[in-house]
Amino acid sequence: MGVPTLFKKIISNKFYKNIHKGIRDGQTKCNYFFMDYNGIVYNAYENIKKDIEENNYSKDKIEHLVLEEVINITKKLICTVIQPSKITYIALDGPAPRAKMVQQRSRRYKAVMEKDFMKELKNKFKINESKDIWDRSANISPGTEFMEKLSNRIIKAMKEKTFQTHNKNMKVIFNNGNTPGEGEHKFLGLLRDMRKMESKKDDKIYVIINSSQMGET
């Protein structure tokens, strides 16, 4: 639930002179890297969607491919593109407030109705329909079996030091989907606490990937 075009407006505003509009692999200094993770999961699915559609994969196989693609994207972002020196904070969306749950339910009911309507039209006019074996919206939601698998896969990668950069002092913190609140709310709370504790002399640089704004810039 992002504010449309907000991030694009901020980085295009001359007032925010300290905001980098582009990051080259390993060439932009970064101390803290915050990842609102749900958007990365969606991107991972899109990356392998064609392969899934061309092959008769089982549900378990699809989920395995999505999980491994998520880990590959995460490793590239942390170890090659951003290379944070101090902390990487990965946050999954947890249970939403009741008001948002109601809104999400309404939106998903509408999406199902539209999908059924489009299916009827395609059948009527004999248009080939691509198979949607794995419903990403239903699976990439707090409390699902897939999100539990994702949490376990991230924890495994952390134990295996998959996300370790050349800086051995860099720590990876993972906040899973069992904690209430959206990913950005979780790390913004941590950011506020860090700002209170930090010295004014310290030059800290933060990089934030937000799920609702990833495709905007």
Enumerate the language-model features and the residues they cover.
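Noncatalytic, typically N-terminal accessory segments of nucleic acid-processing enzymes
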Residues: 1-217
